[in-house]
Amino acid sequence: MVGEEKMSLRNRLSKSGENPEQDEAQRSVSDTQSNGRITMKQLIAKKRQLAAEAEELKPLFLKEVGCHFDDFVTNLIEKSASLDNGGCALTTFSILEEMKNNHRAKDLRAPPEKGKIFISRRSLLDELFEVDHIRTIYHMFIGLLILFILSTLVVDYIDEGRLVLEFNLLGYAFGKLPTVIWTWWAMFLSTLSIPYFLFQRWAHGYSKTSHPLIYSLSHGFFFLVFQLGILGFVPTYVVLAYTLPPASRFIVILEQIRMVMKAHSFVRENVPRVLNAAKEKSSTVPVPTVNQYLYFLFAPTLIYRDSYPRTPTVRWGYVAVQFLQVFGCLFYVYYIFERLCAPLFRNIKQEPFSARVLVLCVFNSILPGVLMLFLTFFAFLHCWLNAFAEMLRFGDRMFYKDWWNSTSYSNYYRTWNVVVHDWLYYYAYKDLLWFFSKRFKSAAMLAVFALSAVVHEYALAVCLSYFYPVLFVLFMFFGMAFNFIVNDSRKRPIWNIMVWASLFLGHGVILCFYSQEWYARQHCPLKNPTFLDYVRPRSWTCQYVF
């Protein structure tokens, strides 16, 4: 194949020299017509001909260079593998090969040092933004934000006769911040102290007790009580009892979920080390220091390690830019709600609930839903996590991969949020495979999907004050089906288009259904609601009063 391309390339390059007599005749005719002078018209035509030939040769040249580059990289990997087998120093290729072999091994519960490997690397968007063509897309979003601001100011000036610079929606959404702050401090201090104290007490007493199983089960029970009873219940009770607004609730609930996952990772990664030390009858107990655990609680990862790759310095200018972009995205979402969402759902209440209204609502919600998808990704997975990584000199910045190039949903789930995916993969999927054996791979995958769907729906139900399992149905049923149907074997560009189209439609459905239900509960309140009223959709039966 490469030989044919080389021959075709040589043929095209030598095409002009195949018939020198014919070329000479043409030149003589041209010279005769112009009386020995080359006219400007002929010069322009010749330049166009050369440009066309260059464009025709361009893809062939790139293919040939790509083939040579692939051969070079393949030879480099083979040489590196042969050096590793000869006993040379450990290289990146040997590490990857070892990871591959470990993944195929029978014992799927790898010890911490053979789990996720952290290396110093930049976030993908930081690298892409160095390319002018990609950075232009970033500039386009900034330009769109400016237009949203101007549109809001102009409309308010026309309607009110003055410039209205009020942010009532933001003030309402982030209300009762003092309650949020003391709740967060209570969660943080309990997560810092209780899991560490329980683990340290268990680790020092495990090798001394005469009943290690009972000793371990008792400490595991107390840890479970903390995870579910204290950290799992108290924050939920606070947001409901104090009737916090939606954004404030999201802060508390997402931090609650994050700390539960962090505490689980800390215990899960360190328990095997203590068991191995007791098995080898080591005199030292491998208990991490408080500083190591404290660093992990703030580090932008859910996988515990005693140490991580660190950058040499902190770029405070970079940190400031990331936080400014987070606030910019926050105002971006505000203007999307003001200009695209609020008018849409205010008009919906003028018609009774029907299939026609629902379909129109879904398709009108696609644009704001997609914009919020991009903004959520950029604000949290890129800006927020990179800001904390820079302040902590955390070296591994791979919080996401190129999910926008996904041609399958399985690849999208792996690359959209690498931070959460790593936790689900190592502590849910691999542990389930270790516990139930490799034969139940599909059941383990189903369990991971169910866990993720339940946690997502729990967060939305608590934060919005009603249970409306639209996300659960989309994620658990359609997402699970697409994971098997549109799998990794699909590589053609058409499948990337299908993934994008389904993502657009799905976010339109989510925004439409949840917003309709929110407005219905605002305009059709119940005097004495029962538990069933919190789980029964009110948008289906609400009769708006004008």
Swiss-Prot record:
Each protomer consists of 9 transmembrane segments, which enclose a cytosolic tunnel and a transmembrane tunnel that converge at the predicted catalytic site: acyl-CoA enters the active site through the cytosolic tunnel, whereas cholesterol enters from the side through the transmembrane tunnel. It comes from Cricetulus griseus. The modification N-acetylmethionine is found at residue 1. GO terms for molecular function: cholesterol binding; cholesterol O-acyltransferase activity; fatty-acyl-CoA binding; sterol O-acyltransferase activity. Disulfide bonds join 524-542. Residues 27-37 have a biased composition (Polar residues). Residues 1-134, 203-214, 273-315, 392-439, 487-492 are cytoplasmic. The modification Phosphoserine is found at residue 8. Coiled coil: none annotated. InterPro entries: MBOAT_fam, Oat_ACAT_DAG_ARE, Sterol_acyltranf_meta. Catalyzes the formation of fatty acid-cholesterol esters, which are less soluble in membranes than cholesterol. Plays a role in lipoprotein assembly and dietary cholesterol absorption. Preferentially utilizes oleoyl-CoA ((9Z)-octadecenoyl-CoA) as a substrate: shows a higher activity towards an acyl-CoA substrate with a double bond at the delta-9 position (9Z) than towards saturated acyl-CoA or an unsaturated acyl-CoA with a double bond at the delta-7 (7Z) or delta-11 (11Z) positions. The lineage of its organism: Eukaryota, Metazoa, Chordata, Craniata, Vertebrata. It is a multi-pass membrane protein. One of its GO terms (biological process) is cholesterol efflux. A motif (FYXDWWN motif) lies at residues 399-405. It is found in: Endoplasmic reticulum membrane. Residues 157-176, 241-248, 349-365, 465-470, 525-546 are lumenal. Keywords: Acetylation, Acyltransferase, Cholesterol metabolism, Disulfide bond, Endoplasmic reticulum, Lipid metabolism, Membrane, Phosphoprotein, Steroid metabolism, Sterol metabolism, Transferase, Transmembrane, Transmembrane helix. Its main location: endoplasmic reticulum. The active site is at residue 456. Its EC number is 2.3.1.26. This is Sterol O-acyltransferase 1. It is an enzyme of class 2 (transferase). The chain crosses the membrane at residues 135-156, 177-202, 215-240, 249-272, 316-348, 366-391, 440-464, 471-486, 493-524. An acyl-CoA binds at residues 411, 414, 417, 421, 429, 441, 452.
